[in-house]
């Protein structure tokens, strides 16, 4: 995604979703926000495999906080995973993600 990020940003889409870290390559919310600017909606890329499968509430909360911080205050942002949830993700991990998001948005 990195080599194509500026091209993607130039297309003028209203929003952009991007994949979670894979094979040692991570695309941060901050990197995408810099390319797309403060007015377009970004869809976060929390790691649904490593992060949520570990089911560590504090780690999940910290990851949510970091994505929110990187997106920027008042910039449109949808907190979500960067790929589908595996079948074995604990529901408690999903709840931790939702509760963390609510604590920043409400």
What residue ranges belong to the model's regions?
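Active-site loop segments of alpha/beta catalytic cores
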Residues: 1-106
């Amino acid at each position: 995604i990195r080599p194509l990020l500026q091209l993607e940003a130039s297309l003028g889409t209203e929003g952009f979703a991007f994949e979670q870290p894979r094979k040692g390559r991570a695309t941060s919310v901050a990197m995408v926000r810099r390319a797309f600017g403060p007015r377009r909606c970004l869809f976060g890329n929390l790691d649904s495999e490593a992060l949520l499968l570990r089911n560590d509430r504090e780690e999940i909360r910290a990851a949510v906080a970091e994505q929110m911080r990187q997106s920027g205050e008042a910039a449109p942002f949808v907190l979500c995973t960067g790929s589908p949830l595996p079948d074995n993700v604990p529901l408690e991990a999903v709840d931790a993600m939702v509760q963390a998001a609510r604590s920043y948005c409400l």
